[in-house]
Regions:
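Non-heme di-metal
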Residues: 8, 12, 16-361
């Protein structure tokens, strides 16, 4: 399906989309003017605040010493190693959907150039997230294990079910843009979390700390992504009629039920062999409620933070912690002190002033 990088167009043409072969790309309409983005005139200050937050917390996986977790990894039995590897395989697939299709779809409904800039940032970081899992794989797993994990993620029924449901929402040009935002928030704030449980659990037991540090950095990003896109959904929903708003809410809860039914099966597949299934289901129901809250809606499930394994809840905190940059990068970075330049900074004196340039040294 991925041919010469044209993943988006290939999906449109494939049977995954269901009959999209007959679709035609929109006729090209040339523009007569292109305007520069002006960050000094921002119509929605949430765009500016989100941009600043995202750029402030920029990170890369290569700065985190995952190899330091090898001793912990060797202590895990085969069942737990299988769960860790396949959890990250699933997360890689979902982040691939987000980076390649999700943000592209959302950018079709932007209202300002600043919103486009924020979504560009989010799209890049989703690619960083997807690449981060490969860093983990290359450190902890053998080449044969990595190959098996990716073959599994590309074919596993329940994982593919949720990836395809979300991708089809993104790729359908006739789909309501607000529904695409709902799908995005459900993926960001709900569906990822069956995978996030594992590294947070190990972090709470002081295991795989550097792997978990990557996940905490991803969690910190996803927290901002889900909140921002949920806000944009709420802004758009306010422009709809009362009936349209109710229809959207009815659809939203039905879609969540549909996703949760599949997520239950996926969770059993991943966690039954290690005995964590019930705890993970509580965790994902709690995060489904968080997704609804990001969209301005009431919770669906009775589960609250107090019902979640406290070891995992402690790890899910996205508050910033600093580490020495040259030993281990944490989910907060110490930045060098800077000051604004002024005219005197450009007052460079001639080093030869007052000297006879013809004189020998």
């Amino acid at each position: 399906m991925y041919t010469n990088g044209f993943w988006y167009l290939d999906l449109l043409k494939s049977n995954v989309f269901g009959g999209a072969q007959s679709m035609k790309l929109e006729e090209f309409k040339p523009v007569n003017q292109y305007k520069a983005i002006n960050w000094n005139e921002v119509s929605d200050m949430i765009d500016k605040a989100t941009w600043e937050k995202l750029t402030e917390q920029f990170w890369l996986d290569t700065r985190i010493p995952v190899a330091n977790d090898m001793d912990d990894w060797r202590e895990l039995d085969d069942d737990h190693q299988w769960t860790v590897g396949h959890v990250f395989g699933g997360l890689t697939l979902l982040d691939t959907v987000q980076s390649e299709a999700g943000l592209t779809a959302l950018k079709e409904d932007v209202k300002t150039p600043h919103e486009t800039a924020v979504l560009n940032n989010i799209q890049f970081m989703e690619s960083v997230h997807a690449k981060s899992y490969s860093t983990i794989f290359s450190t902890l797993n053998t080449p044969d294990q990595i190959k098996e994990i990716f073959e599994w993620s590309d074919t596993e029924e329940y994982l593919q079910n949720k990836a395809v449901k979300i991708a089809n929402m993104y790729l359908d040009p006739s789909q309501d843009p607000l529904k695409k935002k709902v799908a995005n928030v459900f993926l960001e704030t709900f569906l990822f979390y069956s995978g996030f449980y594992t590294p947070l659990y190990y972090l709470g037991h002081n295991k795989l700390n550097n792997v978990a540090e990557i996940i905490k950095l991803i969690l910190r990003d996803e927290s901002v992504h889900g909140t921002y896109i949920g806000y944009k959904f709420q802004v758009g929903l306010r422009d709809r009629t009362e009936k349209q708003q109710q229809d959207m809410k009815d659809w939203m809860y039905n879609f969540l039920y549909e996703l949760y039914d599949n997520e239950e099966k996926y969770t059993h597949l991943l966690y039954d062999q290690v005995g964590w299934t019930d705890d993970v289901l509580t965790f994902i129901r709690y995060n489904a409620n968080k997704a609804l809250m990001n969209l301005g809606q009431d919770p669906l499930f009775p589960d609250t933070a107090s019902d979640v394994n406290p070891v995992v809840m402690n790890g899910i905190s996205t508050s910033t912690s600093n580490h020495d940059f040259f030993s281990q990068v944490g989910n907060g970075y110490r930045m060098g002190a800077v000051e604004a330049m002024n005219d005197s900074d450009y007052d460079v004196k001639d080093p030869n002033a007052g000297k006879d340039i013809n004189a020998r040294d």
